Amino acid sequence: MVDYIQRPKSRFLRVKCNDCENEQIIFGSASRKITCVVCGRTLAEPTGGKSTITTHILEVLE
């Protein structure tokens, strides 16, 4: 059977900070700069659409 329900293109991401190894959940289409809550390193920057992720993505959450 065909699935006719549209799914959103934006996703939540589980990422790991490269400096302090902290795991954090962020929004993939964030409109503001996202920083690590522990060390303050930039994890993602907005680009007008999807964010530019500057760290390691562990998992894409549904």
Curated annotation (Swiss-Prot):
Transmembrane segments: none annotated. A zinc finger (C4-type) spans 17-39. GO terms for biological process: translation. Its cofactor is Zn(2+). GO terms for cellular component: ribonucleoprotein complex; ribosome. Zn(2+) binds at C17, C20, C36, C39. Keywords: Metal-binding, Ribonucleoprotein, Ribosomal protein, Zinc, Zinc-finger. Binds 1 zinc ion per subunit. One of its GO terms (molecular function) is zinc ion binding. Belongs to the eukaryotic ribosomal protein eS27 family. Part of the 30S ribosomal subunit. This is Small ribosomal subunit protein eS27. It comes from Methanosarcina barkeri (strain Fusaro / DSM 804). The gene is rps27e.
